[in-house]
Amino acid sequence: LSRGLGDVYKRQSYNRFVELQKSVVLHLTMFIKEVLLGTCTGVAYVDSTPLRVCKHQRIPIHKTFKGLAERGKCSMGWFFGFKLHLIINDRGEILSFMFTPGNVDDREPLYSESFIGNVKGKLCGDKGYIGKQLFEFLFMNGIQLVTKVKSNMRNSLMSVADKIMLRKRALVESVNDELKNIAQIEHSRHRSFTNFITNALSAIAAYCFFPKKPSISLEYVFDNQLTLF
């Protein structure tokens, strides 16, 4: 009993724990980048998800992230906060991530060498990543960008394997869902930017330790063609 009480006394209170979080931000970032990130398998998915910091009614009086958070628009409508840009492989492992203000174009992080340095092969994204300049830039870096075609664009030939991989793009949305609903990466209780970053990094680290992640099954047959199931 005395040993158990001693362990209780050594534990930090919630307020003290939050205060101590900021001292490990750099260490946590390095641990994620060097240890927890997955390995590229030749097939990757990219997507962005909003991280709201307050409700619409409180935007004019919000002070915590003044000058940092911005208004942005996603498929669910307008929001105020930041964006989390993710690249994952077919096993649901995070290959790279980046935080930006909410008004940043989804394509902009893909021009960053640090964001795409761990990616090779095919990179599947939604229509928001369409761009000739981006396609050429990624192609020169060993990445083939695969996206759907807009209705007002000229139709281009696409292999059956690429079409099937695009249908599996919901995989990255499942990862975003687990980060928000299980790892709690998004909430409006932050009182500083450091606290926001620490919580977000902690959620990403926690997801990397999940024993079971969303995934799709890929197999290479003997004729060197890619088959998806």
Language-model regions, residue ranges each:
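Anion-binding and metal-coordination hotspots
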Residues: 121-124, 137-142, 197, 201-229
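Helix-centered, glycine/charged polyanion-binding patches within enzymatic domains
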Residues: 122, 127-194
